[in-house]
């Protein structure tokens, strides 16, 4: 894996975490 692949993987993980957080916040309200 090169740095570009790692950066893309990290960005995808961040986006998934933000979507999960948003879903949890909507569920709690």
From Swiss-Prot:
It comes from the Bacteria. This is Small toxic protein TisB. Induction: Part of the SOS-response regulon, controlled by LexA; repressed by LexA, induced by DNA damage. Antisense sRNA IstR-1 inhibits toxicity by inhibiting translation of tisAB mRNA; subsequent RNase 3 cleavage leads to a truncated mRNA. IstR-1 sequesters a standby ribosome binding site in the tisAB mRNA; as the levels of IstR-1 decrease during the SOS response this site opens and ribosomes are able to bind to initiate translation further downstream. Disruption phenotype: Competition experiments between isogenic strains with or without the tisB/istR-1 region were performed. In the presence of DNA-damaging agents deletion strains were disadvantaged and were almost extinct by 4 days. Toxic component of a type I toxin-antitoxin (TA) system. Overexpression causes cessation of growth, induces stress-response, a number of membrane protein genes, and leads to cell death. Inhibits ATP synthesis, ATP levels drop drastically quickly after induction. Part of the programmed response to DNA damage; damage leads to increased accumulation of the protein which slows or stops bacterial growth, probably allowing DNA repair before cells continue to grow. It is found in: Cell inner membrane. GO terms for biological process: DNA damage response; dormancy process; SOS response. InterPro entries: TisB_toxin. It comes from Escherichia coli (strain K12). The chain crosses the membrane at residues 6-28. The gene is tisB. The keyword ATP-binding does not apply. Keywords: Cell inner membrane, Cell membrane, Membrane, Toxin-antitoxin system, Transmembrane, Transmembrane helix. One of its GO terms (molecular function) is monoatomic anion channel activity. It is a single-pass membrane protein. Pfam families: TisB_toxin. GO terms for cellular component: membrane; plasma membrane.
């Amino acid at each position: 894996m090169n740095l570009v692949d790692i950066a893309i993987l990290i960005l995808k993980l961040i986006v998934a975490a933000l979507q999960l957080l948003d879903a949890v916040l909507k569920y709690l309200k």
